[in-house]
């Protein structure tokens, strides 16, 4: 009887792999129930799907087994097996970036399993296979004007959930959240900010981080149209939408609007619109743009931005620049009104504050 219990414990490799996948699928690292999705509305994350696919493929190719049949001895892997696996993936036509991702998935699995399988796992073997060189290919950028055109096109021409698709695009460009995070936003995640009269949206974004941003009361009232359209008291704001359906909708919209198919305009392109907007309307404050994008560093933020190099405001130019103030004294009231009607928000707010404090 004791031997049988020991055998069940020692040979539960599949259960331990499932534990790893569940760990990757957890919505919140903090375990805060305010931000956890109920099981009835949770989707299996793309992250988990990717890890699961990588793991199944590896053991099928290298060990010739399904993950449900694995025993501890199958966890032993040599550097030649890893090298041969990389070669196998290359011959299958996978790009280097995808191969690197798969190898990272495996190393993370083995790191998770090491504690319970010390006699079978040697993590150093993963260091014998070098990461393959990759060329970073960014998606194409878009603008607020173009994104709004796409949103309106979806509203007019899409047969299924046209209003929801339109508001999804508008939500994406305003919040700069990732698609997966937006699809998990619940009505209770949008709370009134009494100090401004606008609304705070809180989501679980990349890395299980709780992040927040604001939306205007005007746009929130637009979102409420979804409640009026659906009487089912749904918890999710964008109930029924999926990344796949949105990708297909965007593809159709690009075709209708004459956007070249070779242009890499994807759902993730919408994230950069809000980042660009904040940068331009904050007096080119890169840190404010970084906060809008919820990035750890400004280098990541700059990848999303469509700004061009402008040396006119560089220190090397402006330190020695003398500004002629005579046009300021010669300007008419109409000149000032015209200027401030087209000024960025930071400049306009500074001027209004100056006038009010006089």
From Swiss-Prot:
Statement: the UniProt record of this protein carries the keyword ATP-binding: no
Molecular function terms from GO: DNA binding; site-specific recombinase activity
Residues at the active site: 178, 206, 268, 295, 304 (o-(3'-phospho-dna)-tyrosine intermediate)
InterPro entries linked to this entry: CB, DNA_brk_join_enz, Integrase-like_cat_sf, Integrase_catalytic, Integrase_recombinase_N, Integrase_SAM-like_N, Tyrosine_recombinase_XerCD
Keywords tagged on the record: Cell cycle, Cell division, Chromosome partition, DNA integration, DNA recombination, DNA-binding, Viral genome integration, Virus entry into host cell
Disruption phenotype: Little effect on the percentage of cells with partition defects and no change in sporulation frequency. However, yopP disruption strongly increases the extent of the partitioning defects seen in codV mutant strains (by about two-fold) and, to a lesser extent, those seen in ripX and dif mutant strains.
Superkingdom of origin organism: Bacteria
Annotated ranges, domain Core-binding (CB): 23-114
Domain Tyr recombinase as annotated: residue spans: 137-319
Pfam families: Phage_int_SAM_1, Phage_integrase
Sequence intervals crossing the membrane: none
GO annotation, biological process: cell division; chromosome segregation; DNA recombination; establishment of integrated proviral latency; symbiont entry into host cell; viral genome integration into host DNA
Family of the protein in this entry: Belongs to the 'phage' integrase family.
Function: Probable recombinase that does not seem to have a role in chromosome dimer resolution per se but rather may have some facilitative role during chromosome partitioning in general.
Protein name according to UniProt: SPbeta prophage-derived probable integrase/recombinase YopP
Species assigned in the record: Bacillus subtilis (strain 168)
Gene: yopP
């Amino acid at each position: 009887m004791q031997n049988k219990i020991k055998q069940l414990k020692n040979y539960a490799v599949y259960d331990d792999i499932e534990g790893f996948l569940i760990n990757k699928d957890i919505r919140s690292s903090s375990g805060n129930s305010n931000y956890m999705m109920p099981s009835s509305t949770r989707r299996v994350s793309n992250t988990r799907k990717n890890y699961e696919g990588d793991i199944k493929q590896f053991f099928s190719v290298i060990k010739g087994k399904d993950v449900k049949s694995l025993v501890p001895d199958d966890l032993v892997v040599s550097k030649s097996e890893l090298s041969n696996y990389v070669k196998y993936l290359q011959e299958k036509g996978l790009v280097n970036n995808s191969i690197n991702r798969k190898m990272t998935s495996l190393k993370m699995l083995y790191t998770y399993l090491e504690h319970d399988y010390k006699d079978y796992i040697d993590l150093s073997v993963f260091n014998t296979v070098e990461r393959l060189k990759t060329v970073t290919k960014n998606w194409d950028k878009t603008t607020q004007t173009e994104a709004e055109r796409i949103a309106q096109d979806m509203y007019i021409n899409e047969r299924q959930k046209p209003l929801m698709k339109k508001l999804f695009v508008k939500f994406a460009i305003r919040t700069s959240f990732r698609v997966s995070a937006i699809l998990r936003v619940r009505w209770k995640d949008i709370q009134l900010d009494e100090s401004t009269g606008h609304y705070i949206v809180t989501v679980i974004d990349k890395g299980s981080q709780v992040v927040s941003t604001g939306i205007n009361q005007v746009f929130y009232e637009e979102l409420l149209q979804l409640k009026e359209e659906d009487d089912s008291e749904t918890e999710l704001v964008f109930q029924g939408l999926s990344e796949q359906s949105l990708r297909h909708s965007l593809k159709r919209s690009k075709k209708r609007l004459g956007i070249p198919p070779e242009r890499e305009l994807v759902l993730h392109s919408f994230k950069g619109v809000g980042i660009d907007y904040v940068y331009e309307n904050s007096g080119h404050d890169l840190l404010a743009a970084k906060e809008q994008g919820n990035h750890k560093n400004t280098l990541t933020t700059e990848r999303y931005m469509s700004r061009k190099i402008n040396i006119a405001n560089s220190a090397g130019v402006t330190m020695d620049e003398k500004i002629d103030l005579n046009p300021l004294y010669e300007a008419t009231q109409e000149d000032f009104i015209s200027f401030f009607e087209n000024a960025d928000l930071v400049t306009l707010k500074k001027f209004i504050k100056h006038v009010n404090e006089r």
